UniProtKB/Swiss-Prot annotation:
This is Enolase-phosphatase E1. Gene3D superfamilies: 1.10.720.60, HAD superfamily/HAD-like. The lineage of its organism: Eukaryota, Metazoa, Ecdysozoa, Arthropoda, Hexapoda. Bifunctional enzyme that catalyzes the enolization of 2,3-diketo-5-methylthiopentyl-1-phosphate (DK-MTP-1-P) into the intermediate 2-hydroxy-3-keto-5-methylthiopentenyl-1-phosphate (HK-MTPenyl-1-P), which is then dephosphorylated to form the acireductone 1,2-dihydroxy-3-keto-5-methylthiopentene (DHK-MTPene). It is an enzyme of class 3 (hydrolase).
Length: 246
């Protein structure tokens, strides 16, 4: 069988969904509806939990250059909006931001305004790997809920049943080898039994340092490869190549 490992761990953005879907559809959607969303859900328990995380993150970020504080009182809503936009502009991957984004996307998916993009090779290959007895997981900087919504409301319908579990940065940063050890412990396997697919070299390197195997994906619109760094990994253009005998 071409894939020896029993566990397939998938990055999402740039691996099984396009970077352009995230950058040109999901992120702009948050920016577009953020003010209305906060106004609509401000008093909801779910948003208040998001707000608590945002305030805690603001304390951590208070010494960061350009930091936008979250205030109380009459300007509270505006300050939250400005803080979220600041985090997004600076491509911060905080749990607080990702959780709020996930809830906003959920609203968009449920209303039919969003549909999760998947490359056309993804579902056929993952279904075959599942038939082979492989266990499929994801690991993304997006929250586990955001991942679930993408698959539940995908352009192909609800395909969330393929994935046994979703992991996010609560396991640790994707560029840290400890994160992959944490995931292995969480699903009770050895790192050597995990094949991690990603389009980011530092993530692939971290996974390998942890003892996992890693394959590098080259998709349209992904960042240019660094030949020196990427040469250490098997490089594929579609998941179909996982089913080929080398």
């Amino acid at each position: 069988m071409p894939v020896n490992e029993n566990v397939i761990l998938l990055d999402i953005e740039g691996t099984i969904t396009s970077i352009s879907f995230v950058k040109d559809t999901l992120f702009p959607y948050v920016t577009k509806v953020l003010e209305d969303y906060i106004e609509k859900y401000w008093d909801d328990e779910s948003f208040q939990q998001d707000l608590e995380l945002l305030r805690a993150q603001a304390v951590i970020d208070s010494n960061v250059e350009g930091f936008v504080p979250i205030s109380t009182g009459d300007n509270a809503k505006t300050s939250v909006i400005n803080n979220v936009l600041w985090q997004m502009t600076n491509d911060k991957k905080t749990t607080a931001l990702k959780q709020l984004q996930g809830h906003i996307w959920k609203d968009g998916y449920e209303s039919g305004l969003l549909r999760g993009h998947l490359y056309e090779d993804v579902l056929p290959v993952l279904n075959k790997l599942t038939d082979f007895g492989k266990k499929i997981y994801t690991y993304s900087s997006g929250s586990t809920k955001a991942q679930e919504y993408l698959f539940q409301y995908s352009m192909y319908g609800d395909v969330s049943g393929i994935f046994l579990k979703y992991f996010d940065t609560k396991m640790g940063p994707k560029g840290s080898e400890t994160s992959y050890i944490n995931i292995a412990n969480e699903i009770n396997v050895n790192c050597s039994d995990i094949l991690f697919l990603t389009d980011v070299v530092v993530e692939a390197e971290a996974a390998v340092k942890a003892g996992c195997n890693s394959i590098f994906l080259v998709r349209p619109g992904n960042a240019p490869l660094d030949p020196e760094k990427s040469s250490k990994f098997r490089i594929i253009k579609t998941l179909d190549e996982l089913l080929e005998t080398e």
